[in-house]
């Protein structure tokens, strides 16, 4: 999968001279190639002799043989193509010098016509070249990284000196016609002078083979110096202790998301930070590719800043940007910066909570583990900090001894070190044989605070089969005790290709691609890695490679192969310890003094506080008013004031204080809502749950401090304890005359407008705590709800009912036809359902002899959200033995009327009266009772009953434009007609009796009317409030009905009940004749208060922002 970039990477302005670097590089590269071939082959030397001599004499230095000069020109050509400014300067200097020499020869005169032609042509070419180079100056913008120039120069001098001495000795042994006094200058010209001096300056010639040898000695010295310089560039620019310390701090703050984050501390990488210091990218430069390692480290909000800094770095030095192992989130960030993304493969993630050895998919692992255990293997798991130094040395020796390659591989997904004192949080998993000898081991690095990521896997050649499987399984099974919730295993390249190519019906391209991968797996173990991870049934997380454009994909690929260690270049220093000398941390971060030179993690709390002090909170962006209040809190604390002290009960509530006598000493606590300052006198309004009171702070009355102290310390919304005497202000307003006060809770966020409060309904739902603090209506509603719940309990308790609690997590969803919420228990590895009703468990209690029982609790249905529905709601279910559904008509009416009395002070329901007002409507007395069929008949204007056939009902539904499903029976169509034509249009509370049996699977058939169930629904103002049944107690009939429901569930009906065998077994012990009631308490509260369900619930479910 390839993700294309939405915009181009920001680059320099393209000018008409953009071709100059490439042209200059090609020109010099051609001369370098021909010079090399001429130094090797006499035939080539003979073929190009004439043009070579002309170029060498008039245009550019081109000796007959010189390996050293060929090497120099090759470096210069590569640098020119890479737009290196130093290469531009060297070439320009060479051309200017050549032009000067040509001009001098022309001015001197005395030349032949051929020489004049050559010198004039050469001078003209040089002038043109100088003009082009000068005009193309801005195209050579890239720099060269810092390196050990003096060390490289010393190597070059020493190598050149050795080459000169050896060459001098050779020319003394085989002088040819070279004069003795010219031998040392001649070899010096050939070894370190690149044969630039005219051969005519020397007397005689040695053998041409020696000329090649002299140039080779010079080339070897140059190559050695170049290698030293390039290696020093990487080593000098690698991580310093401060860099590593900063990275570790970022990992502790933000390292939970990326399993590869800890590998950013690999010390042969370089790093570049965002200017804020809150994000960084680690990278390595290979063959001109700046290869970033995975995602940026740090705050994702600062990733783009770090990526931009990295891209600018690439542009500065002329590197091609590339990324290895980016996650989906990281690839999106790189894509936003202008790169393309190509899916490389997938990372295998084990979630220990879901891991088990049981099941058919785990058969292979289970058998391998069994074999390993039979061989007597045990597993030991320890943190590196718990391993002694001597034992760690043995561990390192074992890791080196069992490695099947000369050097350690890895870059983006490997740490490259074992047993380092800075890695004490790493985890070591060891397999021990019966003699307690280690036969295999895994080392895993931290992944945030609760994960580990595989770094190293080793096993002895003598370890039994199944050793690795045993270690991985034991780690997953013991993970909870180790505080581990995620385990990152190996990375499988091109995983999707293996899966798609092996699928039935895979196309020829997919099969060919898979065959190629299998073929190359003989050397690179691509398929082996996939198979070794797949058997654990992990979660596969994609990883991506990023690149600038398609033409650099091969270059980025080769750089990745080199960086990962699959291709080891000569003189590679993969096993060397790299310690950089140039810290990359931003000055503002280094200036905090929190970073450590040894690379250990800084004080994270200090790092966070430092960011906050700079106005750059790593956790959140704070509004100005919040920052002002935080600063005030800081000042209070510095003054020794505890803004959040231990509580002391006030002597009075506000309501009690208002009723107290004048001069009575009272203490109240509450929230400050308004403040009026008149200099030495200050008025404030304080509110607690019982009411609001004016408090008066007068300098002459305060026992300690002044009113100005209150004004300076207190903001609107703060919680304050006031102590003083009751009295009145000069205007006669009843007030608390404050003697002393105490801040008991600093409010860090401003309250809404003090006059209007919260007016946005959505804001009131999301911040109910603020709504309750400022809105008296919200407090009235929550009080009314409490009164309704208390009244329901008291009414039922007075009738002899006992309250019970039944399971919310249930193995079978039943008790009602509704779509359930599904969850999962890891311990038993099975799905559970949040109950849609407590009915089946309450009936079990009825079987056990509990004759009057009720439960008032939460139920859950995965259905719509509107003014009368919330997925989580309060449900009352009550059962009375030796009763039927008609008994519950009076009891239900009494429950609701009592609840209205408790909430409103009278048996009334609040109804809209226009203009946003509510008016009470009486609900006392006896309520209407109708049968369902009679009510539907009234609405249709045509009589129907339980015997009306399905065709007639469908005709009536079509006439009334009521939709129905083809698979519905007559009862379901009647129910649909009832819901549309009767329920939605009902005003005063009405009981609708005798529903069709087919839509009441848990209800007893009517005692005298076939096809009718003894059930009623209570409806008021278009809302169903409750339902009651004469419960079905016949276990045989009950089984038949539930089996019908289970068939519907198996057929795909998500609302149909499942077959609860345990419930049916309980029913077979016989349940007495019982009447049952189910009532939606939330809807009763809505009826009584006249408000929607979202207003009456303290915390209704709100859609995420």
UniProtKB/Swiss-Prot annotation:
ATP-binding recorded as keyword: yes
SUPFAM superfamilies: Class II aaRS and biotin synthetases, Nucleic acid-binding proteins
Disulphide bridges, residue numbers: none
Signal peptide: none
Places the protein is found: Cell membrane
Reported cofactor(s): Mg(2+)
Cofactor note: Binds 3 Mg(2+) ions per subunit.
Keyword line: Aminoacyl-tRNA synthetase, Antibiotic resistance, ATP-binding, Cell membrane, Ligase, Lipid metabolism, Magnesium, Membrane, Metal-binding, Multifunctional enzyme, Nucleotide-binding, Transferase, Transmembrane, Transmembrane helix, Virulence
Primary location group: membrane
Binding locations of Mg(2+) 2: 1024
InterPro entries found in the cross-reference section: Aa-tRNA-synt_II, aa-tRNA-synth_II, aa-tRNA-synth_II/BPL/LPL, LPG_synthase_C, Lys-tRNA-ligase_II, Lys-tRNA-ligase_II_N, Lys-tRNA-synth_II_C, NA-bd_OB-fold
Residue ranges crossing the lipid bilayer per the database entry: 20-40, 62-82, 86-106, 117-137, 154-174, 186-203, 208-228
Record region (Phosphatidylglycerol lysyltransferase): 1-603
Residues that bind Mg(2+) 1: 1017, 1024
Topology in membrane: Multi-pass membrane protein
Lysine--tRNA ligase: region residues: 604-1105
EC number: 6.1.1.6, 2.3.2.3
GO biological process: lipid metabolic process; lysyl-tRNA aminoacylation; response to antibiotic
One Gene Ontology molecular-function label: magnesium ion binding
Pfam family membership, one: tRNA_anti-codon
Highest taxon above the source species: Bacteria
Family statement: In the N-terminal section; belongs to the LPG synthetase family.
Function: Catalyzes the production of L-lysyl-tRNA(Lys)transfer and the transfer of a lysyl group from L-lysyl-tRNA(Lys) to membrane-bound phosphatidylglycerol (PG), which produces lysylphosphatidylglycerol (LPG), one of the components of the bacterial membrane with a positive net charge. LPG synthesis contributes to the resistance to cationic antimicrobial peptides (CAMPs) and likely protects M.tuberculosis against the CAMPs produced by competiting microorganisms (bacteriocins).
Protein name (database record): Lysylphosphatidylglycerol biosynthesis bifunctional protein LysX
Taxonomic placement: Bacteria, Bacillati, Actinomycetota, Actinomycetes, Mycobacteriales
Gene: lysX
